Amino acid sequence: MSIIKITDLNLLNKKVLIRSDLNVPIKNNKISSYARIHASLPTIKFALKNLAKVIVTSHLGRPTEGIYKKKFSLFPVFKYFKKILPETNIYFSQNLTECSSIKSGELIILENVRFNQGEKENSKILSKKYATLCDIFVMDAFGAIHRNEASTNGIIKYAKLACSGLLLESELKTLNSALTNPVRPMVAIVGGAKVSTKFKTLTTLAKISDTLIVGGGIANTFISIDHNIGKSLHDPKFIEQAKILKEKYNIFIPTDSRVSTTFTYDSIATIKSTSDIHANEEIMDFGDISIKNMINIIKKAKTILWNGPIGVFEFKNFSKGTEQLSKAIASSDAFSIAGGGDTLSVVEMFKVQNNISYLSTGGGSFLKFLEGNKFRIIELLEKHFNKFKNNNF
C-alpha cells in the first residue's frame, strides 16, 4: 500500500483541506465524548505547526441532505476547538466560498458536509467544489473510509494532490499488522446484537485468531444451536452458519448467563446454566463461570482484538460481563485493539481508555477492514502517490 503521508509534504502557505471524523455524540448542544476529536488533533496540529492554511470538514449524524438542522451542526465542535487551541485563530464557516481569505496558521471548521446537496451520492459537481478549496487534500477519517461520498471519495479524484493524515496512517498500519502478523496467542472478542451484520467479521476472526469469544445476541445465536434460549435476542437465519463456525474453529461460547423475565434498567438478574433457560427468560449477560473462563483466556493472550459489548452493559445488573472484559483487557500485557460500534462507549464508561494499546475510531469501517474489504478511497490515494513520485510538489 503506497500512499503519500502528510509528513512527506511541504505545507507552508498551502491550503490544506482535512477530512476528519468529528462525528461525536452531541446532546442538548453538549458533546458527550471527545474521543474522535482528540484522535483527529495530531493531523490538524501538524498542519498548523507547518503554517498551512487549514480547513477541516466532517460529517455529523444523519441529517436530511440539503436541510439544516441545529442538532446536526458542527458548531459545538468548533467551540471545543476554540477551547483546546486557544492560540490559533479559528473560524466557523457554513459556506464553502468563505475559505479564500484564510491565512497561514489559521483554521476554518466547515459545517457538516451532509448538509451539502450531493454529498452522499458522491456528486461530481460537489466533489469539484471541495477540490477547488485546497492545494492538498488530506484524508484522515478512517471512520468514513468505507463511504464513497463527495468529501471522502469524489474530492480525491479532482484534488491537485491527496494524502493520508496521521490518524488514517496509524489506523491502517495498526490494523493491518494485527490481522496479518499477530503475536500469538491471538484472542478476538465480538459482541453485539446480530450475527447478520457481523458474520463476515466473525468468519475472518475465527480463521485468524486462536480463540474467538462471542457475546451478546451473537453468543445467543451460538447457544441456540444446542439449547433453548427463551425469548433471547438472536439471529435464527444464521444458526446453520454459526453451527459450521462452531464445529470448525475454536469459539468460546458462554455456558452460564445472567437472565431476566423483563428488559428494563432495574431488571433482576438470575444466573443460570445456558442449558436451563426457560421460555419466558432472556439472556442479557455472561454468568460468573463464563466471566472467569473468559478472563483466563484473555490473560494468556499476546494480541487482543475487541469489538462490541458482551451484554446489556447499559443496565446495571447486566454490565458485569462487559465491565470485567474491559478491565481484563486493560490489565493485560497483550497488544490490544478496541473499536467499532459501542466499544468506545464501553471503554469510556469503564474508564479503561488509557490502558488499551490502540483505540480505533472506526465503526462500520473497522468491521469492513476486519472483513478484508478493499477500499476504493485507498486505491484513489495510491494513484496520487504515483503522481507525487513522478513530480515534485
Curated annotation (Swiss-Prot):
A Pfam family of this chain: PGK
Its EC number(s): 2.7.2.3
Record GO biological process: gluconeogenesis; glycolytic process
Subcellular location(s) per record: Cytoplasm
Pathway(s) of this molecule: Carbohydrate degradation; glycolysis; pyruvate from D-glyceraldehyde 3-phosphate: step 2/5
Catalytic class of the enzyme: transferase
Annotated family: Belongs to the phosphoglycerate kinase family.
Stored PANTHER family: PHOSPHOGLYCERATE KINASE, PHOSPHOGLYCERATE KINASE 1, CHLOROPLASTIC-RELATED
Annotated protein name in UniProt: Phosphoglycerate kinase
Source lineage: Bacteria, Pseudomonadati, Pseudomonadota, Gammaproteobacteria, Enterobacterales
Gene that specifies this protein: pgk
